[in-house]
Amino acid sequence: MKSLKSSTHDVPHPEHVVWAPPAYDEQHHLFFSHGTVLIGIVGSLIITVAVVGNVLVCLAIFTEPILSHSKSNFFIVSLAVADLLLALLVMTFALVNDMYGYWLFGETFCFIWMSADVMCETASIFSICVISYDRLKQVQKPLHYEEFMTTTRALLIIACLWICSFVLSFVPIFLEWHELSVEEIKAIFKDNKTEKEKALEAHNFSSALNQTLGDNQKSNAKHVCLFDVHFTYSVIYSFICFYVPCTLMLTNYLRLFLIAQTHQVRIRSLQMTNPPQLRGQGASSYRNQGTQGSKAARTLTIITGTFLACWLPFFIINPIAAADEHLIPLECFMVTIWLGYFNSSVNPIIYGTSNSKFRAAFKRLLRCRSVKSVVGSISPVSPAYRAFSWIRPSRLDLSSSEHPSDACDTGRGKNSKGGDCATADPTKPDVSVSEEIIYAGTKVFDSDTAFSS
């Protein structure tokens, strides 16, 4: 969503009498004549990283059994798709528009482009908010999470997320709820004609004039894709699509941090009250939970903090620019827009550096290795092996042996290794099964599963 981009109108051409604001065109041309190369390089880099990174995220989740079995990763796919569409459908045309200084793709696509911009940004924001909520539910009630977050419920949440994003973008823009009328502009700026007023007058004038122009004349006219945002529309959109989700994200992060602190208190309590022989066992479990919870909180902080750093400047400036366009320089406004776009290229990098499962999947995809070769190379004692084993129901089946070769032969009273079957005390829990049960309860605190457990 941009305060300077949605209705298409003519920019003055030296050979024709199509009237439009020369002040805007001169300022626009002057700015980009000195920075076109830099804009092209930086914009192309942001787009490339966003496309490659988000494609890798989607491929990693769809091709890795460790990642594809997680309901949480459905929401990461939603975020990656939103960022990918933003890069392909919005950033690409925004870069061309900013480099040329005028719109090349027609009036109809101007509306589609602006609507896609608002929809993808909104879907990205909502997805990050849902991810933080999903993460909190795992930490709060890990044993009930699988029952709560079913595949149907996860897909329903994603569907609602995208439907809301579509309604908040395409409907208001195509119904022109966002636009200022000439009367509203005159009431705000009184007798001083502004660039927006001239633009709207030019649009009304040129719409009638273009009907009398020849095909060659109309083909030579240059157009600008403007988004003349009503102040009320800007405030409502910013509140619903940014400030409310951000408040929820920060609340979820705070609650997750408090849970991690609670486990730290339990660790100290166990160390002080339990006897030495039990202190190590209980404290070790809580210590792992507390440490992993702190890592998960830090990862969530990085995601949320990066998002705020990228989008907060734009959502502060946008209502101000809608109220009075002269308060915000064009250059400053464009920097905040591209800073928001930059968030779409940062998210895959954060996943790749903070999650070992994503790192392994990215390496496999970049090296074109098969899934079987990666799974076969995982050590039985590695965290990745434990995570992969955790998704297999047989690992928690107490009626079956994990190692068939060690099964007890009831006829001989011996196992396959010659050991005495009687040495296994049925009253004592099996160590491997106990580890799996503990892992099932504590895996949500693992930093590697901060957003993909």
Curated annotation (Swiss-Prot):
Family of the protein in this entry: Belongs to the G-protein coupled receptor 1 family.
Region (Disordered): 397-428
Tissue: Reproductive system.
Role summary: This is one of the several different receptors for 5-hydroxytryptamine (serotonin). 5-HT plays important roles in various behavioral and physiological processes in aplysia. These include feeding, locomotion, circadian rhythm, learning and memory, synaptic plasticity, and synaptic growth. This receptor is mediated by G proteins that stimulate phospholipase C.
UniProt cross-references to PROSITE patterns, sorted A to Z: G_PROTEIN_RECEP_F1_2
GO cellular component, one term: plasma membrane
Subcellular location(s) per record: Cell membrane
Descriptive protein name: 5-hydroxytryptamine receptor 1
